[in-house]
Regions:
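N-terminal intrinsically disordered, low-complexity, charged/polar
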Residues: 85-87
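Hydrophobic transmembrane signal anchors and adjacent membrane-proximal interface regions, especially
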Residues: 4-9, 66-68, 256
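Acidic-aromatic substrate-binding/catalytic surfaces of carbohydrate-active enzymes
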Residues: 21-83, 93
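Long luminal/extracellular ectodomains of secretory-pathway precursor proteins
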Residues: 90, 95-97, 103, 108-574
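Fungal secretory targeting signals
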Residues: 1-20
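Boundary/junction segments of secreted and surface-exposed precursor proteins
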Residues: 19-26, 406-412
Length: 574
């Protein structure tokens, strides 16, 4: 009888809220609430948001719904209370800010009257050291059969093709045709390049629009899952990886109390991508959002400067990253405790980063290829301050380049595998397997695309080059090996004219070792352009080189399927 009364009460509440004319929060009882407006409504339980009604259709159905979690599915946040913390108007449109409280922090839904969706943001109070942190929707798979990111658009593989006997590794299956593969990692995309992403069908679309990405961890090369098919249930997954780890060596961030992720817009429509694109442009033009009542969020300044190489060239199109104060034990990709900003310099080397939160930052700059493709050094400014309402102009910045003479370079120095065969191709599982066991690259004859993006098989990859001068004993040659990524289970020795000058081996130590070569999952998780960038220098005696024909060989001595080395650039200089 009690259950019947509760169901009847809940049904009557749903009927009542369906007739609501503005944004609302209604408590149902037993840690259950209904939120929404005159366009949509959702029933929020202790952990999961279900019964998402939009245009009189339940968009969740039998799927899991909306939730917030960290460290994968291990920890789904439990909501202990809900309340409206602000009720106001903006541009004469009423809105409410609904706060759901968990032990780890506060999840906010900002709902405007007539809005198709809601703004969301999360404020940390007690998240542990992380790791992965995300918000997401798991939606009805018949309503949302397709996925879209800035780099991929199409039908999500049907659950019927995920055959248990065909599973070969982490969330990866051999397709029923026995030739191709099915994996959620093929739906990866660049985090900071997204305009909008989500899942859609012919009548409904659910999208995330993140115009301000300063709360993301990592730099330009940050890539993450966006959408996919849940392999256990078939749910259509719309994944908001606000602190992702899927392609990194490590991620261990301590978040300050008050760290805010968002706001971003969760947007509902009829499945139209052109409409979502138009909404995305509106949101990007509106950021930072003026309606948000948070002093720290609005305390911002700007950073600008002009980068000039020490040889006089402008640092054209250089990648500029504003991150943690230097020195730091973390790589630029691994930084993620606070707020981070990325941009590119223009042709003259000038750059401006607007709307930077006030605080102290470290500046790092590196080549993004193009006219400075040969620059293998990194410019760093250990600390700079950003003050509210002020422009921090760094003036002219001199970036020291290597004074040595270059004997050869294979590939642009840009932290990516762009230019090589399959380098930067759409995310695709096992594409590295198309690279050969043995390869010979002839400097001056071969093209960049003759080198392949990754080395995964046992064999020799050799660079042959001509040296027109007698070796000078006073000049020590330096071999620079820049890796766009590395997945463990592969070892390589490096030879110059038959003499070992180094190695690329996980965990090795010693004079010729790449100490600390840790693994990232890039190559075996469909990445083709980058994982985590690594840089190594191997110095050796000038007597190893000779006047005339020379060669450098990377000999793969140990391999694991789809693991190995993803190349950025190889440079020999003296």
């Amino acid at each position: 009888m009690t259950k019947r009364i509760f169901v009847t009460l809940a049904a009557s509440l749903v009927t009542a809220v369906a007739a609501a004319t503005g944004p609302f929060l209604t408590a149902v009882g037993n840690q259950t609430w209904i939120i929404g407006n005159d366009v949509w409504n959702m029933t929020q339980g202790p952990k999961y948001g279900v019964k998402l009604y939009y245009k009189e259709h339940d968009c969740v159905g039998d799927a899991v719904g909306h939730y917030v979690s960290y460290n994968g599915a291990a920890n789904d946040l439990a909501w202990t209370s809900a309340k409206i913390v602000k009720e106001d108007t903006y541009n004469n449109v009423p809105y409410i800010d609904v706060l759901f409280t968990a032990a780890e922090g506060d999840m906010h839904w900002v709902i405007f009257a007539g809005q198709h969706g809601a703004y969301q943001y999360f404020v940390n109070h007690a998240l542990p050291t992380l790791g992965e942190f995300r918000t997401l929707w798991r939606l009805d798979n018949t309503t949302f059969p397709n996925g879209r990111t800035v780099t991929k658009d199409g039908v999500l593989p049907p659950l019927s093709e995920y055959l248990p006997q065909n599973k070969i590794q982490d969330e990866t299956w051999l397709a029923p045709d026995g030739k191709s593969y099915i994996t959620k990692y093929d739906w990866t995309s660049w985090s900071r390049a997204q305009d909008f992403f989500g899942v859609y069908g012919d009548k409904f679309g659910s999208w995330y629009i993140n115009p301000g990405k300063d709360y993301y961890n990592g730099n330009h090369a940050k890539q993450e899952l966006m959408v996919h098919r849940e392999s256990a249930s078939g749910d259509a997954v719309q994944l908001n990886m606000i602190h992702g780890t899927h392609f990194m060596v490590s991620s261990s961030d301590v978040f300050p109390d008050g760290k805010m992720w968002g706001p971003w817009l969760w947007y509902l429509n009829d499945g139209s991508k052109s409409d979502a694109a138009a909404q995305s442009k509106t949101e990007f033009a509106s950021w930072p959002y003026p309606w948000l009542d948070d002093e720290a969020y609005h305390s911002r300044g700007s950073v600008s400067g002009k980068l000039v190489l020490s040889d006089g060239r402008p640092a054209s199109n250089a990648a500029v990253f504003l991150g943690d104060v230097l020195p730091s034990p973390k790589t630029a990709l691994d930084m993620g405790s606070t707020y981070y900003y990325t941009t590119y310099a223009d042709a003259s080397g000038s750059f401006t980063i607007p709307d930077v939160r006030t605080g102290s930052y470290g500046l790092q700059v590196w080549s993004n290829g193009s006219s400075i493709r040969d620059v293998r050094t990194t410019f760093a400014l250990d600390s700079l301050a950003v003050e509210k309402g002020k422009a921090t102009n760094l003036g002219s910045l001199t970036w020291a380049v290597s004074p040595k003479r270059k004997l050869f370079q294979v590939g642009d120095f840009d932290h990516y595998s762009y230019g090589f065969k399959n380098g930067g191709a759409p995310w695709q599982h096992a594409l590295v397997a198309e690279c050969p066991e043995n390869l010979v690259y002839k400097v001056g004859c071969s093209k960049t695309e003759d080198w392949c993006m990754g080395q995964t098989y046992k064999g020799n990859w050799t660079i042959r080059f001509w040296n027109g001068q007698e070796p000078d004993a006073d000049k020590k040659p330096t071999l620079i090996v820049s890796l766009a990524g590395y997945s463990s289970g592969a070892s390589s020795t490096i030879w110059a004219n038959g003499i070992q000058v180094g190695n690329l081996t996980s965990g090795a130590t010693g004079r010729t070792a790449t100490d600390g070569l840790a693994s990232d999952p890039s190559l075996y998780r469909s990445a083709t352009a980058a994982g985590e960038w690594r840089y190594f220098q191997f110095d050796f005696a000038a007597s190893v080189l000779k006047k005339g024909a020379n060669e450098v060989t990377f000999q793969m001595t140990r391999n694991t399927t789809w693991h190995g080395f993803m190349w950025d650039s190889i440079i020999l200089e003296w």
